[in-house]
Amino acid sequence: MRTDFSENAISAKVHALYGRRIVRSQYEELCRKHTTSEIAAYLKERTHLTEVLNTVQPATVRSDQLESILHKGRYNKYLDLVKYATPKTREFYRSYVLNLVEIQLILQMIRLINIGRTSEFIVSYPAFAESDLRIGLGKLSKVKTYDELLEALEGTEYHDPLLRYRNTDKKNPVINYAGCEMALMNCYYENLKAIVSRTFSGETRREIDDIMATKIALENGIIGYRLKKYYPDMTPEDIKGYMLDFWREPPMKLLDTALRAKTAEDYLNTLKNGRYIAGIGDGEIQSIGLGSQAIRSLLSQRYMRRTQQPAVAFVCYMFHSEMEIDNIVRIVEAVRYGMDPSEIMQLLVII
C-alpha cells in the first residue's frame, strides 16, 4: 500500500515521542522517591510528561488522579496522531484504540457487578473520551445487573458475545469474567483483522499481520503458562478453551505437546525448543513467563526501530505508552508500600 504523504507525519511524530521515552536512569530516580508527590514532581519537571502534567500540583495530587491524568494525556496523543490519518485508514486507528477502551470499560463494569459495587463506575470512567465512544457511558453508569448491561449494549457488536455468559443461577449469580474477557477480545481482534484486510496491503499489511499474530500467540502462551502453573490438573482442551482465536495458525502439534507437559516450566521449554513463533528467539519466548507488559515491550522494541510504515509505528507507540503508564503506576504503588528501589526496578518493563 502506498503511504499517503500526510500519514508520514504520524511516523515522524511517533518516532520523536519514542525518542523522548522514560529511560532506565529516570526509572531508577523515580524508584528512589518516597511519596506520590515526589514522583509527580519528577515526572513533571524531568520527563517528557511536562506538558501532560502542566496543571498538576504535585504536592496535592492523589495516585488515582495522577493515573487518570496520564491516561488522558495518552489519549490526547492518540487524537493528535489520528488527525493525520487518511479517510481510508482512519477506521483502523479509531478501532485499534477506541474499541479497546470500550471493552475495558465493559469489563470494568462486569467486575463491579460481580462484587456489587456498580456505583463506583461513574467515578473512574474516562469522561475525556466519552464523545468518541459508541457505547453510552451515561447509560452504562446506570447499570446494576448483567441483564441491564446487556440491554445497554443492545445494537453493538459486544451484545451477542456476552449474551452466552448470562447467568440465571440465583444461588451463584457470579458472571464468568474470564469467559467474557475472551469473548470480547476475540470480537476485537476479529473486527481489527477485517479492517486491516480491507485497508492495507504490501509491507504495511505484512508487518501488522506479523505484530498482531505474534502478540496473540504470546498472549495465548501466557494463558497456557499461568493455567499450567496454577491449575496443573487442567486438561489441554480445557486450557485451549481459555485461549484467544489465533490471528495466524500456530504449529498446533507443538502447542498440544506443550500443553501435555507436566509443569509450567516444561511447557515453556517445549515452546522455546520447538520454535513456537517464527522469527522469535528463546529469550523472547521467555517473555511469556513475564506477562503481557513484557510482550508489549518486546513488540514495541522489535518493530519501532525498523518500520517505515505509519500504522505499524502507531501500534508500537500505543504499546509503549501503555507500558510506560503501567510502570509509573507500579512505582507509585510500590513506593507506598515502602519497597526497596532495587525491588521496584524488578517490577518494571524497560526498553
How would you label these PLM feature ranges?
Residues 1-351:
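N-terminal domain-start signal
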